[in-house]
């Protein structure tokens, strides 16, 4: 992979804060941190456009005693077999469950599936976390 050197102008206090944070995180150098930021910027743009294939997780916490939430969750997961790769179910206590659903597919469709799951009655909290499949990243 060919590397290109370029320069940027940045306020000194912003750079000082950036250097402090990347040192705390453990980056070996500024260049690797900048590369990660650029990759993240590209991935977020792909989500907004919605055409690119993404991977991610939909994490939800729900009360399994409330209504038909368990049946609705299972029905939705079976409806999207091509996009839902796997799921992990954890009993948090006697009433609450945590479900982590691994997904892969077109960004728009993954967002739509997450919206459907997160809006189910009985779901207390949830979050979609998307990332790249890695195919297009350098």
UniProtKB/Swiss-Prot annotation:
Its cofactor is Ni(2+). One of its GO terms (biological process) is response to nickel cation. CDD domains: RHH_NikR_HicB-like. The keyword tRNA-binding does not apply. Binds 1 nickel ion per subunit. Keywords: DNA-binding, Metal-binding, Nickel, Transcription, Transcription regulation. It comes from the Archaea. It holds the Pfam family NikR_C. Ni(2+) binds at residues 78, 89, 91, 97. The keyword Metal-binding applies. One of its GO terms (molecular function) is nickel cation binding. InterPro entries: Acetolactate_synth/TF_NikR_C, ACT-like_dom_sf, Arc_rbn_hlx_hlx, CopG, CopG/NikR_regulator, Ni_resp_reg_NikR, Ribbon_hlx_hlx, TF_NikR_Ni-bd_C. PANTHER family: NICKEL-RESPONSIVE REGULATOR (PTHR34719:SF2). Belongs to the transcriptional regulatory CopG/NikR family. Transcriptional regulator. This is Putative nickel-responsive regulator. It comes from Pyrococcus horikoshii (strain ATCC 700860 / DSM 12428 / JCM 9974 / NBRC 100139 / OT-3). The lineage of its organism: Archaea, Methanobacteriati, Methanobacteriota, Thermococci, Thermococcales.
């Amino acid at each position: 992979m060919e590397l290109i050197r370029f320069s940027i102008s940045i306020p000194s206090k912003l750079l000082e804060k950036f250097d402090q944070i990347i040192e705390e995180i453990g980056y070996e150098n500024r260049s690797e941190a900048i590369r990660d930021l650029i990759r993240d910027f590209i991935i977020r743009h792909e989500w907004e456009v919605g055409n690119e294939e993404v991977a991610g997780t939909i994490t939800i916490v729900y009360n399994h005693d409330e209504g038909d939430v368990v049946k609705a969750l299972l029905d939705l997961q079976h409806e999207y077999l091509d996009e839902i790769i796997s799921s992990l179910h954890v009993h948090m206590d006697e009433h609450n469950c945590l479900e982590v659903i691994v997904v892969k597919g077109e960004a728009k469709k993954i967002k739509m599936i997450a919206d459907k799951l997160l809006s189910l009655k009985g779901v207390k909290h949830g979050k979609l976390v998307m990332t790249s499949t890695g195919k297009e990243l350098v």
